[in-house]
Regions:
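Short, charged/polar connector segments at secondary-structure boundaries
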Residues: 1-99
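Short secondary-structure transition/capping segments
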Residues: 1-8, 12-15, 102-115, 142-154, ...
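Hydrophobic residues in alpha-helical segments
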Residues: 14, 52, 88, 136, ...
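Short hydrophobic/aromatic-rich motifs at helix boundaries and adjacent loops
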Residues: 19-23, 52-56, 101-105, 116-117, ...
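Glycine/serine-rich loop-strand microenvironments at binding/catalytic pocket rims
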Residues: 39-73, 137-140, 165, 208-233
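Low-complexity, flexible helical/coil segments
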Residues: 57-66, 94-100, 131-138, 183-184, ...
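Amphipathic, charge-rich alpha-helical segments that serve as recognition/docking helices
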Residues: 82-85, 89-167
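Amphipathic alpha-helical extensions and coiled-coil-like segments
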Residues: 159-272
Length: 273
């Protein structure tokens, strides 16, 4: 994991309001390709859609109009827009109140959304981590205090995101599955991280044979086989190793961990209770 290195806090790109409040129809709006939310689960969308059908859009969305274009691009409010599109397709007349801002840079728009969602419904952890990665690379910042000031994320949240970003993209994508039933929860990577480190440090033969990615895939397979009932059960492995008082006890835990990794049907609690 990347360490906390001191860094000068960069100047914060900002979103500049234009002072305009408009009412727009769904077809006047374009969704931003840079929206870091990624996940739009059906159940909360249905709840929001029902509320909009009954009361209209109560909270204005935030949009900007690129120079020379007629349509407005959504900076904040894609969920409301999606619901209004569906309602319009069902025959309802829907308009969205919209605060118009000056066209922002990509990074300014992203930081704006970070701040908005810190005070409202937070993003899922994986989209947050991927958005944070853009911020860190674009602004060349890795210091947690600087990131906190820019995004409003707490330092523990930032550390969790940095752990997620150590996993290859192919694993990150598993937490962006549009189907919540088959999606690997973002916390899976947080809880698996120390277990994988333990494997690399103490089960060197196993780690050399399969590689870190191979070990990760085995844990994913075990989760999909429902042999990891809760991702926090990974903590039992680390607790068992930490409380082992003798080398013989540690070896017994490591032998069980090796068996656990290789046997997809061995459930976590059964192995480490």
């Amino acid at each position: 994991m990347a360490s906390k290195t001191s860094a000068q806090i960069p100047d914060e790109p900002t979103v500049v309001p234009s002072g305009l409040l408009k009412e727009l129809t769904p077809d006047q709006l374009v969704r931003s390709r840079d929206n870091p939310r990624h996940l739009f689960d059906r159940e909360p969308l249905d709840e929001l859609k029902k509320n909009i059908r009954e009361h209209g859009v109560l909270v204005p969305i935030t949009v900007f109009q690129p120079k020379g274009q007629r349509k407005y691009y959504i900076l904040d409010g894609e969920r409301r827009h999606r619901c209004c599109e569906e309602l319009q397709a069902e025959g309802h007349t829907v308009r969205l109140p919209a605060n118009v801002v000056e066209p922002p840079t990509k990074i300014a728009g992203l930081l704006y959304m970070f701040v908005i969602h810190n005070f409202r419904e937070p993003w899922e952890l994986m989209p947050t981590a991927l958005a944070l990665d853009v911020v860190m690379k674009d602004l060349s910042v890795n210091d947690n205090k600087a990131i906190n000031r820019l995004t409003g994320l707490s330092e523990p949240q930032i550390e969790r995101c940095k752990i997620i970003l150590t996993f290859p993209e192919k694993f990150q994508k598993l937490s962006l599955d549009v189907d919540s039933k088959t999606r690997i929860p973002s916390n899976f990577w947080i809880e698996a991280y120390p277990v994988l480190n333990l494997c690399e440090d103490e089960l060197t033969g196993l780690a050399k044979k399969y590689g870190r990615d191979g070990l990760t895939e085995k844990l994913v397979d075990k989760y999909r086989a429902r042999k990891i009932r809760s991702v926090i059960h990974f903590r039992r492995i680390m607790e068992a190793y930490k409380v082992a008082e003798t080398k013989e006890d540690q070896k017994a835990v490591l032998d069980k961990l090796s068996e656990y990794i290789l046997d997809v049907d061995l459930e976590t609690r059964k192995a480490f209770d």
